[in-house]
C-alpha cells in the first residue's frame, strides 16, 4: 500500500520485466564507458579477473540485500531505513544514497547527452571512413552550447520515461531497449574481434599479468563493481520496493548481476580490439576513449 495515495503500490508486471528493468538500471555507462576505461588503466585481464571476483563475492550479495530491504519496506531508500531502524542514524545512509545518485546523475547525464549526439551524427552520416573521431569528440566536449543542448534533451527524455511510472514508463521502455542494446553489443563485438590487430587487444584483455595487481587495482575493481551494479545509492532498494512478494529475489539478483557483468565483458571485447586496431594505447584516452575508438 502506498501511504501517500492510499492506493495499492504498483509492482513490476513479471519477474522478467523486473530483471530487464533492474538490469537496465545497473547496465549503463558504468559498463560500456566506465569499465573499459578503468580496465585499460589498470592492466586489462588482471583487473577483469579481480572485477569478476568482486562482483560475485561482494556485488551480488549486496544487491540481494538492497532488494530485500526494498521489498520488505516498500519504500524509497530514506523511508526504508527509517522503517527498519526508526529514531536511529541509519536514515542518514538512505539520504547519502540519494545524494550519491544525484552526484552520479550530474555527470552521467552529460555523457548520455554525448551519446545522443553521437547517435544523431551516426544517422546523419558524420562517421564515414577516415573521419577524425578524436576531433569530433573534442569539438563536442569542448563546446558548451551543443553539449548542454544534448544534455537537456537527455534530461527531458528521462523525465518523460519516469513520469510514466513503473509499468507504463520504465518497464515498457526497458523491454524494448535492453534486447536492442544486447543485440547491438553482440554485433559490435563480432565485428571488433575480426579487425586487423584485434589479437593484441584480446591478449591485453584476456591474458592476465598478475604483476600489475596492486592494492589500488583491487580497490578500483571493487569500486567499479559497485558503480556498474548501481549499488550503494538506493537504486536497487527502490527497484526492490516494486517487486511482487511472489518473485524469488535470489534468482532475480543473480540474473541482474549476470546481465550487467555480461555487458561489461562485451564492452571490453569491443573496445580493446578496436583500440589496438587503431594503434591507440589502452587507458591513455581517459573518459573519451570509448567515443574516440567507436
Identify the residue ranges that each predicted region occupies.
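Membrane-interface "cap" regions at the ends of multi-pass membrane proteins
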Residues: 1-34, 62-67, 71-84, 88-95, ...
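Membrane-embedded translocation segments of transport machinery
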Residues: 2-12, 171, 175-294
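Membrane-interface alpha-helices at helix entry/exit sites of multi-pass transporters
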Residues: 9, 46-51, 91-95, 133, ...
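Select transmembrane alpha-helical segments in multipass membrane proteins
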Residues: 11-22, 47-50, 88-102, 149-152, ...
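Transmembrane helix-boundary motif of multi-pass solute transporters/channels
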Residues: 14-54, 200, 234-240, 251-254, ...
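Hydrophobic alpha-helical transmembrane segments of multi-pass membrane proteins
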Residues: 20-26, 52-57, 96-107, 153-160, ...
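Hydrophobic alpha-helical membrane-insertion segments
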Residues: 55-60, 96-117, 180-189, 259-270
